[in-house]
Amino acid sequence: SDDYVKARVMFKEEQISEFKMAFDMFDEDGGGDISTKELGTIMKRLGMSISREELQQMIDEVDEDASGTIDFEEFLEMMARAMQDSEREIPDDELRAAFRVLDKNGDGFIDKDEFRALASECAGDDLTDDELLEFMMDYDGNRDGRFDYEEWKEIIQELKVRW
């Protein structure tokens, strides 16, 4: 379809290979399609957070034959749509609100424990302490072991650029 061609152009070959590997992991019978239930898991593994409602809406948009399964072409179209949605600018008030939610103790910083809770939610328990510390050091500009709002904002912008 035209959407598939647009998706192929939008992604680098390396990204398409990553998507294909993730897709194939869940295509257990090798039939070339996966159930819609497994899609949420794949998208999480690829670092995309998406609500159940958003996922269902995306599935409805690409599952043209209403089979309840998604083939790789439909999956790639879906990933392209998800990426385009994620490119919208996040208003500062939304970023500040998210920061306040994550700053559980209200001290104006996201410390290691608060960040660990977020990372566990996003990546499961797959993240080791070393990986967590390495990530924190990459973005902790003043090396105080925690993120202030500006550092947090930089993380969000960087993650959006990666995807």
From Swiss-Prot:
Ca(2+) 1 binds at D27, D29, D33, E38. Ca(2+) 2 binds at D63, D65, S67, T69, E74. The modification N6,N6-dimethyllysine is found at K20. The modification N6-methyllysine is found at K20. Belongs to the troponin C family. Keywords: Acetylation, Calcium, Metal-binding, Methylation, Muscle protein, Repeat. Residues 14-49, 50-85, 90-125, 127-162 form the EF-hand domain. SMART domains: EFh. Coiled coil: none annotated. PROSITE patterns: EF_HAND_1, EF_HAND_2. It comes from Branchiostoma lanceolatum. This protein binds three calcium ions. Ca(2+) 3 binds at D103, N105, D107, E114. Troponin is the central regulatory protein of striated muscle contraction. Tn consists of three components: Tn-I which is the inhibitor of actomyosin ATPase, Tn-T which contains the binding site for tropomyosin and Tn-C. The binding of calcium to Tn-C abolishes the inhibitory action of Tn on actin filaments. InterPro entries: CALM/Myosin/TropC-like, EF-hand-dom_pair, EF_Hand_1_Ca_BS, EF_hand_dom. This is Troponin C. GO terms for molecular function: calcium ion binding. GO terms for cellular component: myosin II complex. The modification N-acetylserine is found at S1.
